[in-house]
UniProtKB/Swiss-Prot annotation:
Complexes and interactors: Homodimer.
Reported function: Catalyzes the first step in hexosamine metabolism, converting fructose-6P into glucosamine-6P using glutamine as a nitrogen source.
Gene3D superfamilies: Glucose-6-phosphate isomerase like protein, domain 1, Glutamine Phosphoribosylpyrophosphate, subunit 1, domain 1
Organism in which the protein naturally occurs: Chlamydia caviae (strain ATCC VR-813 / DSM 19441 / 03DC25 / GPIC) (Chlamydophila caviae)
GO terms under cellular component: cytosol
Catalyzed reactions per annotation: D-fructose 6-phosphate + L-glutamine = D-glucosamine 6-phosphate + L-glutamate
Record's protein name: Glutamine--fructose-6-phosphate aminotransferase [isomerizing]
Entry's transmembrane regions: none
HAMAP family noted in UniProt: GlmS (MF_00164)
Entry's EC annotation: 2.6.1.16
GO biological process: one example: carbohydrate metabolic process
Length: 609
């Protein structure tokens, strides 16, 4: 949830670290800080708020250092204050650490250190790392062995960086079930939670695997070990992103830019995985066999869970294989039945979602037939830990509320359904080609939808509302769930979603005169049922905003306002309706004057429980 950055090289370290932290703010922005080694001591500066606050506090400082670490925080242990901000130092200010993750046994370690006479200055779990390392280092005088020993005492998921005032040429770092990437430049090196933070300097990286530490020296010298200090050889690879991918490119917000990038992202995946006849290409999950499993278990969090929920409807209708969808944070503690012939599908934009990675461990423990990952980051823990991985290829997504990554997930899951139908021969060639034709048309339909002025202006009439009800059925229900989540995330509106058929079982009691109800009517199989539900809430004087296909103009007779979506193949329509929900949330947040890219209390990558 936090962002770590470190630099060692010939440049002045502080400006490099500040720039790197600015690229990591999507991971947390409660507070920020940095520490640098200057002659015979550490320089430490911390502020509450965003990286710009930290930068402003350093404008008049001259920090002659070539080694520094920095941190931008999303609070888990301890409220956002200067004392709880990172970096944390030991009681003698000899070493400084930055940390992302949670130390599960910090209370025991803290009590042990206090019994040794060591004083703590913060409420965080992270300070334990600095104090424990200093305690060991004082006894042994060995920097690397003390670091290794400290790591062996920690329980939990974490990544960290450490510097010491007496070692101005060494940057230590480690990862345990939390991402940390090393960047290798010309006589300089970087560490970061995300490689995007140092792309302006280098595209050569090494990703630390769980249970690995690195000793980074001047001149791009990197030695990698496991926590027991057994040397590990790691290959250097090149990342494909460019620093320009992180720019807004003329848009007011990253979220808006990423909404408008969706047609291109979808078109790229469609042309990669469909042949000219509209059939699924052999390159899609090449070597994948359906004979190994008889059920599917999908596990994810947040928006990715909604994508998995839609996949359940699609796959079960195309292939007649039972599909179970679980929230990862519940799955890991539920003691669910998991058969040996299960295909496990784990979905995570970042590939670092803590609960989803815990589910991966559980599936491995249960020895399921196959584990498939769907994510956007090739060097992520999810991508490297599964049997097969489908990459979103959505490019960098910086807006905290997922847009293009989510629709790419939907597309890959639709393609997965078609792949399974091909392998099981449950779809005729004509039906398959009709689906393919619908997919080929999708990017242009997205562009048409994005040009709909009625959609962009809807918030003008509803920006004073503080509660919405979303209703959908079948394929539209998971998409309504996602639309409601988007309104919560960035417009801070209480938006509740229900299957339309459940209204009479309780939620209809919430309806009073003028209650805004948004209905997604795009599934033709249940269109008449949706009309019936609209009439039910209208009878209770609700104000109904109907989102429907262009061919469903009769919806105007039973609703108060309408947003029309281009006609499309039923399998494709959920993606178009998703974009409607994104624009609704964006325009509402814009009208209310909220910070769209960095909504309160949220972070892009949820790397802790």
């Amino acid at each position: 949830m936090c962002g770590i950055f470190g630099y060692i090289g010939a440049k002045l370290a502080v400006p490099v670290v500040l720039d790197g932290l600015a690229k990591l703010e999507y991971r947390g922005y409660d507070s920020a800080g940095l520490a640098a080694v200057i002659p015979e001591r550490l320089f430490v500066r911390k502020t509450v708020g965003r990286v710009d606050e930290l930068r402003s506090s350093l404008e008049k400082e001259n920090v002659p250092s070539s080694l520094a670490i920095g941190h931008t925080r999303w609070a888990t242990h301890g409220v956002p204050t200067v004392k709880n901000a990172h970096p944390h130092v030991d009681e003698n200010s000899a070493c400084a650490i930055v940390h992302n993750g949670i130390i599960d046994n910090f209370k025991e370690l803290r009590s042990l250190l206090i019994s040794e006479g060591i004083s703590f200055s913060s409420d965080t779990d992270s300070e334990v790392i600095a104090q424990l390392f200093a305690f060991r280092y004082q006894a042994t005088g060995d920097l690397v062995h003390s670091f290794s020993w400290t790591l062996s005492q920690l329980q939990g998921s974490f990544s960290c960086g450490l510097i010491h005032k007496d070692h101005p040429n060494v940057l230590l770092c480690a990862a345990q079930e939390s991402p940390l990437i090393i960047g290798l430049g010309e006589k300089e090196s970087f560490i970061a939670s995300d490689a995007r933070a140092f792309l302006k300097h280098t595209k050569s990286i090494q990703a630390l695997a769980s249970g690995e530490l690195a000793v980074v020296g001047l001149g791009s010298e990197v030695e990698t070990y496991n926590f027991a200090l057994k040397r590990i050889h790691k290959e250097v690879r090149q990342v494909v992103y460019t620093d320009a991918d992180s720019d807004k490119q003329g848009y007011s917000y990253y979220m808006l830019k990423e909404i408008y990038e969706q047609p291109e992202v979808l078109e790229r995946l469609i042309h990669k995985y469909l042949d000219q006849q509209g059939c699924i290409s052999e390159k899609f999950l090449n070597g994948f066999s359906i004979e190994d499993f008889d059920e599917i278990s999908i596990v994810a969090c947040g928006s990715s869970y909604h994508a998995g929920f839609l996949a359940k409807y699609i796959i079960e209708s195309l292939v007649s294989i039972p599909v179970h969808v679980e929230v990862a944070s519940e799955f890991r503690y539920r003691q669910a039945y998991i058969g040996k012939k299960t295909l496990a599908i784990l979905i995570s934009q970042s590939g670092e979602t803590a609960d989803t990675l815990a589910a991966l461990k559980e599936f491995r423990r249960r020895q399921v037939a196959c584990v498939l990952g769907i994510c956007n980051v090739e060097e992520s823990a999810l991508a490297t830990g599964v049997d097969h991985c489908l990459f979103l290829e959505a490019g960098i997504e910086i807006g905290v509320a997922s847009t293009k990554a989510f629709t790419a997930q939907l597309l890959l899951l639709i393609l997965l359904g078609l792949k399974l139908a091909t392998l099981k021969q449950t779809l005729s060639l004509e039906e398959h080609r009709a689906c393919g034709k619908g997919l080929f048309e999708l990017p242009e339909l997205c562009n048409r939808l994005l040009a709909n002025e009625n959609l962009h202006s809807w918030a003008n009439d509803y920006c004073d509302e503080d509660r919405f009800i979303f209703l959908g059925r079948r394929l539209m229900y998971p998409i309504c769930m996602e639309a409601a989540l988007k309104l919560k995330e960035i417009a801070y509106v209480e938006a509740n979603c229900y299957p339309a058929g459940e209204m009479k079982h309780g939620p209809i009691a919430l309806i009073s005169q003028g209650s805004p109800v948004i209905t997604f009517c795009g599934d033709p199989v249940v269109y008449e049922k949706m009309v019936g539900c609209i009439m039910e809430v209208k009878a209770r004087q609700a104000h109904v905003i109907a989102v429907a296909s262009e061919s469903q103009e009769d919806i105007a007779a039973v609703s108060d306002a309408q947003i029309y979506v281009p006609n499309s193949h039923p399998l494709v329509s959920p993606i178009l309706y998703t974009i409607v929900g994104q624009i609704m949330a964006y325009t509402m947040a814009l009208k209310k004057g909220y910070e769209i890219d960095r909504p309160r209390n949220l972070a892009k990558s949820v790397t802790v429980e």
